């Protein structure tokens, strides 16, 4: 993944800089997300690494995307096709989203809980994280019954393990040392 990120970063940065300059960050986010989904489609994926000439591949890809991709987005697709990089479009989209979140002072946090969190609990977690991180927080909630109780919160390098299984594990380590 690190190698893909290294290759994809210049494309994502160029697209992001262009989007900011033209006040079109949200439309570029939608466009790259859609194009990324197209590139991951099982019918399209084999063509990205196939024997089609870059101009044919770009034309086909743009036709499949239709009106979801504007002229500047089509230019990005053409450049990536010429360089044999359409296969990393999903990584470009992810990096673009990271640039967008940084620019908008937003961060995503993964919250794993033993049971489904109520909207009030989600709001409390969101408010606490926003204070701690000084950013707007978007929660991605999931359920893992093996936690027994509590939550695990991950955002970037921050990991908060408030799960019962995590506490039991730490207690076990202390007792064994």
UniProtKB/Swiss-Prot annotation:
Superkingdom per UniProt: Bacteria
GO cellular component: plasma membrane; proton-transporting ATP synthase complex
GO molecular function, a single term: proton-transporting ATP synthase activity, rotational mechanism
Location of this chain's protein in the cell: Cell inner membrane
General function of this protein: F(1)F(0) ATP synthase produces ATP from ADP in the presence of a proton or sodium gradient. F-type ATPases consist of two structural domains, F(1) containing the extramembraneous catalytic core and F(0) containing the membrane proton channel, linked together by a central stalk and a peripheral stalk. During catalysis, ATP synthesis in the catalytic domain of F(1) is coupled via a rotary mechanism of the central stalk subunits to proton translocation. This protein is part of the stalk that links CF(0) to CF(1). It either transmits conformational changes from CF(0) to CF(1) or is implicated in proton conduction.
Family note: Belongs to the ATPase delta chain family.
Protein name, UniProt field: ATP synthase subunit delta
Gene it is expressed from: atpH
């Amino acid at each position: 993944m690190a190698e893909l990120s290294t290759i994809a970063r210049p494309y994502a940065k160029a697209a992001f800089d262009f989007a900011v300059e033209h006040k079109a960050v949200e439309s570029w986010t939608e466009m790259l997300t859609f194009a990324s989904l197209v590139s991951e489609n099982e019918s399209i994926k084999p063509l990205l690494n196939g024997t089609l000439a870059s101009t044919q591949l770009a034309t086909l890809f743009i036709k499949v995307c239709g009106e979801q991709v504007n002229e500047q987005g089509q230019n990005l697709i053409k450049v990536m096709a010429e360089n044999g990089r359409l296969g990393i479009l999903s990584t470009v989209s992810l990096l673009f989203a990271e640039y967008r979140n940084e620019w908008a002072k937003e961060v995503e946090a993964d919250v794993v809980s033993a049971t489904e969190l109520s909207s009030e609990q989600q709001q409390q977690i969101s408010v606490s994280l926003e204070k701690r991180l000084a950013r707007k927080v978007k929660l991605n909630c999931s359920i893992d019954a093996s936690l027994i109780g509590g939550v695990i919160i991950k955002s970037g390098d921050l990991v908060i393990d408030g799960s019962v299984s995590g506490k039991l594990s730490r207690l076990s380590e202390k007792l064994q040392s």
